[in-house]
Structures are given as structure tokens and as C-alpha cells.
């Protein structure tokens, strides 16, 4: 390890965004970069990280997960657990490996406020393409990247339950799409996953480890940052605790990449946030930015589970007696049930005709099991994960004290608006309608969860309150926006904290609003784009491409109803 005490850039957090920055910023050989990760290393021999199907094991395990929990959610009457990666790669080392860009119209929404124009889809698309190596796309696909560090597997969704689910979508009046990250997101089809040759493709494995051979990159794990140092409003360095000792390093710039929980926490501890709130915690305000920790978004989801009449599901793979054989197949050949995350297909649909683009995402699984490993009591089963994708419920994060080791108070306010409740009722009814189509008849052995007793709107909402889980997509807690927006925290042109010098934010907290899918891909894109901004490089040229828009494009544009891909 380097013993230098001064760096051009100190990156707080070796997660998704921090891994991208650690790689891109060290492409400038004259810049010294230090990445500080509070968790441990993502060892290549660690099966719970590297084996795709082991994704359920790290959550709730203190060796992999910081194990956050919300306060009692006021509209659910209970606390909600939140897993956050406690290893190099952050949550990309323990997540579900699902790669979803979000809808192009998400980014058009980002760009609506004055000053945010450079974050529209045309400006973001080239950065998505720069990070991707899309094995499921043709070399001439103008929407997808082909040479990036993130290797993406398409589907394959060959289990017959996937085909029946896709066909059920068509019977219910929807369309199939070959690539939900391409021209047409809306519809049913295979998903991309960050799995290559049977192994997880985390941000650290794709970006950070290849860069570690560079002499100008230093990565320190188990390094918990406790303080950012300032000279007036200029960040000058950080203090971190490692192996029981405190260390201080100087920094030309400090970049916060701690994620949607830790970035606003460190900002508040540094005196950046709502001035009155900070004073109440005994912290002298440095910069009054009331948006720090506010505008907090997340996706809530439920599982609709069915018994499967035919022995085609993956339910038997959950049998403890089979696990040694499944593990051996993976260890020696990187094949078998352990070589996939099994989120190989799903859908994006609109729950009503008033929304402009899909507000529901379905993850379909040919197995009935909860994220924590609790399996349904059936020999064979399948399930669909569903939830609203752009709810208008907003939460907040607030520190409890000046102690950097004390976890902050978190409330997402799930189900806090009438619109949110209505979308939830629509989500369950849409999902049930699809799962009741004739295409599912050969397999449909009846609904296990929530079960036939849950029918009315209020019964549905009661079940969601009891059973809903986070989809693990926290974002927007230090959002980008123009200085004219009193709730914005980060300058979208520089990624600097408003009013501060040499202090930037690059992670999910900077998203101005969440996207309509899993957020790992948008975070990688944001970090790629931010790296060029920080380096002072000319940004990649915007790419203005046509994409499917409901009510504007032909209804069948981009649909793949008879594509041979689906003829398993």
C-alpha cells in the first residue's frame, strides 16, 4: 500500500460509482488517486459474491451487508430492512445483477429544469454505450455498446415458464420486445444481466481491479471515512479509521461516492445541509443546503407467487441436498443452476393510459423464493416481482448525532400518497391479469401469495403494507439541479456541491429522480459522464436517436411478436 499523504483525488467509497472513477481518473497518469472503501475486499474466491445464484446469501450477513433499516414507516406500520454492500464494489457486489438503463423519457425528465439540458437521453446514451459490452446485441445496434468493461448476458430465458409468461403478456394485450434497453423498452422479453462466463460482473471487477496495476491508483479497504477537512468552504482532505487507527490525507479534491445513504450522511456531518437541523445536532452549519438527505426515493416491490403444476421450475434447486452438486458444477465449469441470477426476463408496462411510459416493471422468476431465501411450500413454483417505478412518495435521511459510526435515521414514506396507493392497486391487478392468461394454464397451479382472499383495493394495500420489500434502489438524496432550485445539492455541470470548492458528489444520491427500473446501470452511466467532467475532457457527442414513445410511435414499432428468439 502507498504511504503517500497527499492525492489529487480522494474518492470516498469503492462502490459502483467509486470504481468507475478510480479507473477513469487514473487514465491521467499525472493524477494520484486514492479510493477509500469502508468494507472489505471482494475476494475472487468468495462464492457468495462471485456465484450469481448465491445472491440471496450476502443480504443480512454482516460480513457483506451494512444492514440498514428504516425507522417505522408511517404508512406501513413497520420497519423495512435495506441491504447495502459492505465490500469493494459496494452493492454491485451483492445485488441481483440486473442491468436496466431506465426509459429514455426518464432522462428527458432529468433535463427539463433549466441548467439540466446536458443530462437528456441524447447526452447520456453515449456514456451508456461506453460502459457496455452487450453480447445480446448485433454489432450494428446503434442503441447498445460493444466494447465497454461491463459484460452483459442476454437472457437466455429458455425455461418454458418464460415463454409462457411472454405469451401471456401478448394475450393480455401487450407486446414482446427483444431488448428493453434498446429502441423499445415497453413490452415483454429477455433481460440483460451483469453475468459473464458464469460469474458476477461487479463494478469493482470490471473497473477497479483492472486499474489497480497503475502506479497512480491506491485502493484501501476497511477504511471508514469519519471526517472531511475544510479550509473555509474548500475541501482539503479526509480522516479515516483503518485497523483501529486514524489516518489523515490531503486531497486536491474530495469526491463523495458513498451512495444514497452515506453521501448525505457525510455531508450533514460536515455541516452541509439544513442549517437549523444541523444546529439541533450540535453541528456548526458550513453551507445551508436543505435538500441534503431530502427527495429520497426508492422502489418498493412484492412477489406474486404461483404453484407450478408441471415439474419445470427451478424449485428443486433450493433443496439443500442438491446444493453441493450445483456448487461443484459452478466451481469446476461455471455452469448449471448457480451460473445465472435467474432474473432472465420480465416486462415493462403501463398500468393505465394516462402515463406516458411504463410505470411498472416485472421481474419473472421460474422459482418461488423470497430474496432472503425463504422458499414457498411447494414442489414447483414461479413468481413475478412487481411495483410502481416512479412513485411520488418521498422520504428523508437525517443523522442522529455527530458520531459518524451511528447509522442515520431513514424514512422513505412508502405508500404515502393517494397516487402511490392507486398505482399499487393497479400493479397487482395488472400482474394478476397477465398470470391468469391461457398461456399460463399448463403451469398455473394457483396463487400462493397474496392468495385468493386478497381481492379488494384495501385488501391489496394491506397486503403490500405487510409484505412489501425494498427493491434496493435508494437514490436522489443529494440531487443534481440548478442553484435556483433550493432543494438541489449538486451542480449538474461540475458535480460540485453548491457553494463548495473541491467537493463533488458522484453516485446514486445525485440522481435528480429515479429511473423506471433497477438503478445500477444509471449510476454507472452517471459516473462515466462525471469522470469526463472532472477530468475537464470534452464530453462525448450527444446521439439523437429515435426511440419508442407510446401514443407517438406506431403501436407495433419495435415489437417482436414472432421473433425466432421466443421459439424455444
Swiss-Prot record:
Ranges in coiled-coil conformation: none
Residues given in the record as FAD binding sites: 8-37
Gene3D superfamilies for this protein: 3.30.410.40, FAD/NAD(P)-binding domain
Alphabetical UniProt keywords: FAD, Flavoprotein, NAD, Oxidoreductase
Keyword Plastid listed: no
Cofactor: FAD
EC number: 1.1.99.1, 1.2.1.8
Enzyme class: oxidoreductase
Pathway as given in its UniProt record: Amine and polyamine biosynthesis; betaine biosynthesis via choline pathway; betaine aldehyde from choline (cytochrome c reductase route): step 1/1
UniProt GO BP: glycine betaine biosynthetic process from choline
Active site annotation, chain numbering: 473
GO molecular function, one term: choline dehydrogenase activity
GO CC entries: membrane
Catalytic activity: choline + A = betaine aldehyde + AH2; betaine aldehyde + NAD(+) + H2O = glycine betaine + NADH + 2 H(+)
Family as reported in the entry's similarity comment: Belongs to the GMC oxidoreductase family.
Function: Involved in the biosynthesis of the osmoprotectant glycine betaine. Catalyzes the oxidation of choline to betaine aldehyde and betaine aldehyde to glycine betaine at the same rate.
This protein's name: Oxygen-dependent choline dehydrogenase
Organism listed in the record: Staphylococcus haemolyticus (strain JCSC1435)
Amino acid at each position: 500500500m502507498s504511504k503517500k499523504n497527499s492525492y489529487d483525488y480522494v474518492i470516498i467509497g469503492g462502490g459502483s460509482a467509486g470504481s468507475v472513477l478510480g479507473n477513469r481518473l487514473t487514465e491521467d497518469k499525472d493524477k494520484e488517486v486514492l479510493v477509500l472503501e469502508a468494507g472489505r475486499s471482494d475476494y475472487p474466491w468468495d462464492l457468495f459474491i462471485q456465484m450469481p445464484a448465491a445472491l440471496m446469501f450476502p443480504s443480512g450477513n454482516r460480513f457483506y451487508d451494512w444492514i440498514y433499516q428504516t425507522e417505522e414507516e408511517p404508512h406501513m406500520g413497520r420497519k423495512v430492512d435495506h441491504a447495502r454492500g459492505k465490500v469493494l464494489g459496494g452493492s454491485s457486489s451483492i445485488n441481483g445483477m440486473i442491468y436496466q438503463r431506465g426509459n429514455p423519457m426518464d432522462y428527458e425528465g432529468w433535463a427539463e429544469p433549466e441548467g439540466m439540458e446536458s443530462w437528456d437521453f441524447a447526452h447520456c446514451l453515449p456514456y451508456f454505450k461506453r460502459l457496455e459490452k452487450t453480447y445480446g446485441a448485433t454489432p450494428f445496434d446503434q442503441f447498445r455498446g460493444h466494447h465497454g468493461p461491463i459484460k452483459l448476458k442476454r437472457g437466455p430465458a429458455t425455461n418454458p415458464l418464460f415463454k409462457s409468461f411472454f405469451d401471456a403478456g401478448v394475450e393480455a394485450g401487450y407486446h414482446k420486445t427483444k431488448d428493453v434497453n434498446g429502441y423499445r423498452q415497453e413490452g415483454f422479453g429477455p433481460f440483460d444481466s451483469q453475468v459473464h462466463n458464469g460469474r458476477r460482473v461487479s463494478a469493482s471487477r470490471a473497473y477497479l481491479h483492472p486499474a489497480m496495476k497503475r502506479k497512480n491508483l491506491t485502493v484501501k479497504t476497511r477504511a471508514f471515512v469519519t471526517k472531511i477537512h475544510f479550509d473555509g468552504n474548500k475541501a482539503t482532505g479526509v480522516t479515516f479509521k483503518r485497523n483501529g487507527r486514524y489516518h489523515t490525507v490531503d486531497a486536491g479534491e474530495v469526491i463523495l461516492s458513498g451512495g444514497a445513504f452515506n453521501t448525505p450522511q457525510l455531508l450533514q456531518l460536515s455541516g452541509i445541509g439544513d442549517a437549523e437541523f444541523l444546529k439541533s445536532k450540535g453541528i456548526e452549519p458550513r453551507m445551508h443546503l436543505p435538500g441534503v438527505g431530502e427527495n429520497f426515493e426508492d422502489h418498493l416491490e412484492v412477489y406474486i407467487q404461483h404453484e407450478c403444476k408441471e415439474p419445470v421450475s427451478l424449485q428443486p434447486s433450493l433443496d439443500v441436498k442438491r446444493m453441493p452438486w450445483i456448487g461443484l458444477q459452478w466451481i469446476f465449469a461455471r455452469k448449471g443452476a448457480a451460473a445465472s441470477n435467474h432474473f432472465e426476463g420480465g416486462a415493462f408496462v403501463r398500468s393505465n393510459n394516462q402515463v406516458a411510459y411504463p410505470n411498472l416493471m416485472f421481474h419473472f422468476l421460474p422459482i418461488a423464493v423470497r430474496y432472503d431465501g425463504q422458499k414457498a411450500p411447494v414442489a414447483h413454483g414461479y413468481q413475478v416481482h412487481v411495483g410502481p417505478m416512479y412513485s411520488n412518495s418521498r422520504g428523508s435521511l437525517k443523522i442522529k448525532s455527530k458520531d459518524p459510526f451511528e447509522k442515520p435515521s431513514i424514512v422513505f414514506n412508502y405508500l404515502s400518497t393517494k397516487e402511490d396507493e392507486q398505482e399499487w392497486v393497479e400493479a397487482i391487478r395488472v400482474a394478476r391479469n397477465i398470470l391468469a392468461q391461457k398461456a399460463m394454464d399448463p403451469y398455473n397451479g394457483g396463487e400462493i401469495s397474496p392468495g385468493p382472499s386478497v381481492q379488494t383495493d384495501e385488501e391489496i394495500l394491506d397486503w403490500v403494507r405487510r409484505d412489501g420489500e425494498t427493491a434496493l434502489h435508494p437514490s436522489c438524496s443529494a440531487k443534481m439541479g440548478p442553484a435556483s432550485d433550493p432543494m438541489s445539492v449538486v451542480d449538474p455541470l461540475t458535480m460540485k456541491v453548491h457553494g463548495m470548492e473541491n467537493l463533488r458528489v458522484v453516485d446514486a444520491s445525485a440522481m435528480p429522480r429515479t429511473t423506471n427500473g433497477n438503478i445500477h446501470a444509471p449510476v454507472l452511466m452517471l459516473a462515466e459522464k462525471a469522470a469526463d467532467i472532472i477530468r475537464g475532457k470534452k464530453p462525448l457527442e450527444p446521439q439523437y436517436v429515435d426511440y419508442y414513445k407510446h401514443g407517438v410511435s406506431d403501436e407495433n414499432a419495435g415489437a417482436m411478436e414472432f421473433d425466432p428468439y421466443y421459439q424455444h
